[in-house]
Amino acid sequence: MANQLYNPYLRSPKTTAGVMKDVCIALVPAAVGSVIFFGFRALLLILVSVAVCVAGEAIWQKAHGQPVTVADFSAAVTGILIAFNVSSTTPIWVVVLADLFAIIVVKQFFGGLGSNVVNPALMGRLFIMLVYPAKLMSYAMPMDVDVVSGATILSAMKQGGEAGFTLLDAFLGKVPGALGETSVLLLLIGFIYLAVKKEVNVTISAAFFATVFILTAAFGMNPFYQLCSGGLALGGMFMVPDYNFSSRTGRMLYGVLTGVIVVAIRMWGSFPEGVCYAILMVNCMSGLLENLNSKHVYGIK
């Protein structure tokens, strides 16, 4: 598992470093967009988050006599995704706490990459959401809008109001939100890059988005606004795909189940957004889904 993201009996030349490097490249458009939309503080948060994750992993591994694996880019990806899940107004020290919790507690305590049960970046976000919720509730408006802060599309619709932004605004990213989640267009560019490189499970993402679209339409919600708001695009393209799945059926079930939970939380939950919670919940079920749908390898004589 040190070099490979897949089950050992599935032969693939793709290494962890190669895949994670491409994920970093795929996240560049959204990172550039966050700086354009929210200013250079967005860049500062991203750089600090990556630096803390990489340094935290290296120091932990050195202190415990383990091989230092920061060259596989997985810690850098975690740092970028944590920054993408916070607002430009979030204090730097809060982001640092999320980074350290994600890298040390969620990732290293469980044995490092490939051994952690849940997504470290999302657990880092959940940690600061539980400990310092007020620090994550303020969302800045894009710089070309003459308002300092405002409600997100999901918050406005949750309270029974109008979205307040056009669908085009939501697609392009000219809406309040976390750094890396507002522009569906820029995220899509990165996702297509990974799909062309065959380094993302498109089946999971397709099942996830289709489920959200169908269910929200069935319940009388605007499915297009639902797809373009909150962390749905970021989560569906970069955090829902699970590189450890070997069966197509398992991947589809994973995507569908995550989509169902997202819609349930958005409709009946206390919070307007449910992507983070849904992904983490289904992360915990991924082993069961894999075992139910994969061929068992018992060895040879």
Q: Where is each model-derived feature located?
A:
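Cytosolic-side transmembrane-helix boundaries in multi-pass membrane proteins
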Residues: 1-19, 265-301
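N-terminal signal-anchor module of multipass membrane proteins
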Residues: 1-54, 298-300
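C-terminal ends of transmembrane helices
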Residues: 4-7, 55-67, 103-114, 187-197, ...
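Structural signature of hydrophobic alpha-helical transmembrane segments
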Residues: 39-51, 89-98, 170-182, 220-232
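Membrane-interface helix-loop-helix junctions at boundaries between adjacent transmembrane segments
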Residues: 71-75, 80-144
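Loop-to-transmembrane alpha-helix initiation sites
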Residues: 117, 121, 224-232, 251-254, ...
